Each structure stands twice: as C-alpha cells, then as structure tokens.
A protein has these predicted regions:
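A broad structural signal for short, well-ordered beta-strand segments within beta-sheet-rich domains
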Residues: 1-4, 126
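Conserved non-catalytic scaffold segment of RNase H-like nuclease domains
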Residues: 3-75
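Metal-dependent phosphoesterase core characteristic of DEDDh/y 3'-5' exonuclease domains
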Residues: 12-16, 22-28, 62-147
C-alpha cells in the first residue's frame, strides 16, 4: 500500500508529493498487518491524506507520462510499481545506491511538520535519491572518459 508518493523529474528538477487517503478503515485491517503497518508507518497517520487511493494509478501514469525509466528504492517497491505502470522500473539499490541515511538532504522541507524532526519523508527521500542518481550517472560518464 502506498501512503505517501514523491516524484522528482530530474530533467526539469520538478518535485511532486502526494499523500493518499486510507483505502479502507483501520478496523478492516487484519491485526497482524495493523501491527506491522504501525511499526513501519513512518509517522504518517492512517487518516492523513488528500488524494483518493483509487487515484494512485492515474497519478503514476500522469507523473510518468514522459519518463523513459522510473527509479524506486528496493525490490519490493520496484515490483509494486512495475505492476501498476507500463514503464521500465529500476531498483536504484541495484546501481549501488547507499541507504537513505547516507544521502539524505536535510535542507528539503516536508509536507508533514512531524517528518522534519524524524528525517523520514517521501519528498526528501525522492529528492535525495534523484540527486544521488544524477551524481552517479555523471561519475560513470567521467570515469569512462578517454585519457
């Protein structure tokens, strides 16, 4: 399930952030899933959100309409997004991307004030990953320059 989605267009340096409404009530979540979700919720409240969850695919298609490739962090997110959109989806960890804590740009402001104290934010993470990817691509270009 996607609660927060951030998109960075590296060509235009445009960022977008979406917080999705809950797809169903908390009471409908099985007990085990509820405990797991509470442990990894990144401090997003289940009731937060302004975009209908049913709009997730529409948002992805709109945001990726001009993209050649989409980069996700980790195999689980990569598989999930691959199942929703007909684009090349690349797991950025396969390119050697380090953990978030090693690349986080702390100057980026987040939508939720509580995130600013916890350094967990989809927007900050996406922007940090995009900056790492740009650096990585440039490094590869210069590493292969003829001498």
């Amino acid at each position: 399930m996607v609660k927060e989605l951030a998109v960075v267009d590296s060509q235009s340096n445009r960022v977008s952030s979406y917080v999705f409404k809950r797809p169903y009530s908390w009471e409908e979540v099985p007990a085990l899933s509820a405990r797991i979700n509470q442990a990894i919720d990144h401090w997003c409240n289940w009731n937060d959100g302004d975009v209908l969850y049913s709009e997730l695919e529409t948002v992805l298609h709109r945001e990726a309409s001009y993209a050649v490739a989409i980069y996700c962090f980790g195999p689980q997110k990569t598989r999930f997004i691959s199942g929703l959109i007909d684009r090349t989806v690349i797991d950025i960890t396969q390119l050697g991307c380090p953990p978030f804590a090693d690349i986080s740009l702390h100057g980026i402001s987040c939508t939720f004030v509580c995130h600013n104290f916890r350094h967990i934010c989809a927007l900050r993470t996406a922007y940090s990953l995009a900056q790492w990817l740009i650096f990585h691509i440039r490094y590869l270009q210069y590493a292969t320059c003829p001498t």
